[in-house]
Amino acid sequence: MPPVVGIGAGGHAKVIIDILRLNGEFDLIGLIDSDPSRLGDQVLGVPVLGDDDRLESLYQDGVRHAFIGVASLAKTENNKRIFERIRKLGFDIVNAVHPSAVVAGDVKIGQGTRIFGGTVINPGTSLGDNVVVNTGAIVDHDCVIGDHSQIAPGARLAGAVTVGEGSIVGIGAAVIQEIKIGDYSFVAAGAAVIRDVPSRTRVAGVPAKPMTSKPD
């Protein structure tokens, strides 16, 4: 099996490690974490090899595959920066799709996308690069999920919903059909979205309404 290195050593990385082991496609050689104090730690038996400076030497040593094991909620633009840096170094950023996920055969999936257990993604849907569809989420037919966006556990998207780049649909939120959510927006947990959400807007409630502050 080809070796793969993970970026991040927290809870998100744990889930990706488990998915990759279940699928049996890669040899998990280690993790990279920006906190130098994590050197030598283990996450589900996978060692932390060092900080970001190790990536270039790993690539030179023949490691060509990486997975993203971080997904910031507070600073979603950081997710884009991490992805672009890893790709610029030359790594193939692998997808992680849990074997229990129900993904229609024609769903388009970008690079570095993670699809967790118990999810349903229906026909005609497109997932961009570095997307997270978290545990138990439902993405119905003909949705478009932009790069670096996250669909949180238990969120439900009806048909033909568009989620822009870097946006987050929170835990248990519901989005009705044909809604458009702009770039770098945030839908709070449990919200019911019945109107379009502009870019860089936070909404919450039932029905969802704009919150007073905007994400950074």
Protein language model regions, located:
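Short helix-capping segments at alpha-helix termini
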Residues: 23-25, 87-91, 195
